[in-house]
């Protein structure tokens, strides 16, 4: 099972990815974890990414693409993976398509976790993180919307929407149903 998980910050992608990862026996690959691992191990890509992160800039797609390429080629991802936070743009989606083609495989689908923005704000404020103010959260949601909206058209033939409002178990049941599992 090779899936891309889309959804705004606070939609519960990470939570659902952890459950689906265990259920399907495939790794949950998040770009945040990839960045932390590469930086922590001081890989060439990690050193390069750290320069951008330390400067408060977005890590260029070329670096992120290379990290994802290396990660999905690892043995534990041979039977599938769940990508969380990647791709974020059509450019990255095209890169992913090329990466998978080189591995002689393709995506099985794209799950889009759909949740009302006011609920996301409520959820994220409830986490109590100092940097999670309503303005910051709404800005993150705007950036997400602007960045990823073209992906919905790009993946129009393989995207399935999942209502991400409700208890974790309910959302998971909907995700499994959407996948036909």
From Swiss-Prot:
Keyword Nucleotide-binding belongs to the record: yes
Localization in the cell: Cytoplasm
Residues that bind ATP: 10-15, 127, 166
Keyword annotations of the record: ATP-binding, Cytoplasm, Kinase, Nucleotide biosynthesis, Nucleotide-binding, Transferase
Keyword Nucleotide-binding: yes
EC number: 2.7.4.3
GO annotation (BP), single: AMP salvage
Enzyme class: transferase
GO molecular function, one term: adenylate kinase activity
Pathway(s) this gene product operates in, as recorded in its UniProt entry: Purine metabolism; AMP biosynthesis via salvage pathway; AMP from ADP: step 1/1
A Pfam entry, by short name: ADK
A GO CC term attached to the entry: cytoplasm
Residue sites binding AMP per the record: 31, 36, 57-59, 85-88, 92, 129, 140
Catalytic activity: AMP + ATP = 2 ADP
Region (NMP): 30-59
Principal subcellular localisation of the protein: cytoplasm
Residue span of region LID: 126-132
Family classification: Belongs to the adenylate kinase family.
HAMAP family in UniProt: Adenylate_kinase_Adk (MF_00235)
Subunit structure and binding partners: Monomer.
NCBIfam families, per the entry: PRK00279.1-3, PRK14527.1, PRK14531.1
Comment text on domains: Consists of three domains, a large central CORE domain and two small peripheral domains, NMPbind and LID, which undergo movements during catalysis. The LID domain closes over the site of phosphoryl transfer upon ATP binding. Assembling and dissambling the active center during each catalytic cycle provides an effective means to prevent ATP hydrolysis.
Function of the molecule: Catalyzes the reversible transfer of the terminal phosphate group between ATP and AMP. Plays an important role in cellular energy homeostasis and in adenine nucleotide metabolism.
Name of protein: Adenylate kinase
Organism annotation: Rhodococcus erythropolis (strain PR4 / NBRC 100887)
Gene: adk
């Amino acid at each position: 099972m090779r899936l891309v998980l889309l959804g705004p910050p606070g939609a519960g992608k990470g939570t659902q990815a952890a459950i689906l990862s265990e259920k399907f026996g495939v790794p949950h690959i998040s770009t945040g974890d990839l960045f932390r691992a590469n930086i922590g191990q001081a890989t060439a890509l990690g050193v390069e990414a750290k320069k951008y992160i330390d400067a408060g800039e977005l890590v260029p797609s070329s670096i992120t693409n290379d990290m994802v390429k290396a990660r999905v080629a690892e043995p534990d991802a041979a039977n599938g993976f769940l990508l969380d936070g990647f791709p974020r743009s059509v450019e990255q989606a095209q890169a992913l398509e090329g990466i998978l083609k080189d591995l002689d495989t393709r995506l099985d689908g794209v799950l889009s976790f759909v949740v009302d923005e006011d609920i996301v704000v409520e959820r994220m404020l409830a986490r109590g993180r100092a940097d999670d103010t309503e303005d910051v959260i709404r800005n993150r949601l705007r950036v997400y919307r602007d960045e990823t909206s073209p992906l919905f058209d790009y993946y129009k033939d393989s995207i399935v929407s999942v209502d991400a409002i409700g208890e974790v178990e309910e959302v998971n049941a909907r995700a499994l149903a959407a996948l036909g599992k």
